[in-house]
Amino acid sequence: MSCSFQLSLVPSPPNLKMSIRNIINDPFATGSLSLAAMSWIITFISSIVADVQGSFPKLTWWGIVFELFVILFLAVLYIVDDIQPHRLSIVGFLAIATVYTTNSANSLVYSNTSAKNCAAAGSILLSMINLIWLFYYGTDIANSVLVARVFGKQGSNPFTTPQPNRTYTPNDINNTNTNYMSSGQLTGLEKGVDSNAYGNHDDSDDELSADDHYPITVRALYNYDANPEDINELSLKQGEVFKVKDTAGKWWQAKKQSGELGICPSNYVETLH
């Protein structure tokens, strides 16, 4: 018994969900990676033509190759759903790539040949995309949300410890077909409430196990102190494993191993299976 108890305290490593849908389902990733790929192709083809026509800055070629590496690196991280742990590396690579693309744009934009001017335009586009990525991956959650909304996404986990959005609604906590749970329902301390207030009681529900009601296992990515003004919120410890009812909205209805019920911010946890 003691052995199994100790093992339960050690969080298992996260499962990598390799799928191209991780990009397709993320509007920010889809838009920015597509634009970056098109800009890179423009720069690459124009640079080949310019090099054939005459002298071409040698350092620009290294910048083009490095930018391709950055784009592929980001795409792979999205495919394996592993962006969060690599944000610091992403920011470092983007800073280097931005230096190369801006230098290439400065070297080519004043040329009198159309091929070099086209390559300069591609380099300028890549520089702009790199700056957007730097802003998105290198700042806190509030700024990341502002950038993501340009592409139609409502937020993403930042590298720094995120701050949950406290303006949640009942639909953020439960499915649209589920009534919002009051504080008393979550704690089990509500008094004087008719058992039929939330629909007819079905005794068969009592026979369901906790795993039936909370089928999704998650793990806390960061420590989180619940808002003392909201008794619904749960405090989390980094690495803590517990169950959630579903993954809809920004706040998930959860049940800890101690049996405590409440809600937790979705950007503080990751699903395990």
Swiss-Prot record:
Its main location: membrane. It comes from the Eukaryota. PROSITE patterns: SH3. It is found in: Cell membrane. It is a multi-pass membrane protein. Keywords: Cell membrane, Glycoprotein, Membrane, SH3 domain, Stress response, Transmembrane, Transmembrane helix. Residues 49-59, 111-117 are extracellular. This is High osmolarity signaling protein SHO1.
